[in-house]
């Protein structure tokens, strides 16, 4: 039996300890193969073919400015314009380090995010999936807003209520385009340019991509 306001996949016959259920908790960067059945950001397979990754906080660093992403297009700013938080996490069994970077452009009201993996172990690891970010938040009857279009008319707004399950915008063309724009926003009903809540996520540049709400 599930009580009202129970986490979606947590069976319970009493009100005692539920902390063993990972899908009961908000996750900053969820990983696959450890018992959380929501969408993961990172799936890693080891040399034995086993898939599972569990990262834990190690340390963090805050500094002015923003480091370049080697080989990738990215936003940039001076030490006066942007401040960055790097969070180092690690899976000790795999010897895998994960660096989560958050750069705050305060005047623009923008936070940019990126992820870097560092293999410190002795085995080869296969990255099955890696996503740039996760935003785990309470539902406020959000609607999902996406953009699509055609040549010379790229920005048609499509908006509708979030349904149970998963909704997404994606592309497997190897590039982003007017057909599927790499942008998703969650907005409260009745939101305008002057009022309402808007949480938007957008790739600076993109090949194949997926933006998904669950």
Where are these regions (language model features)?
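Polysaccharide-binding surfaces and accessory modules of carbohydrate-active proteins
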Residues: 1-214
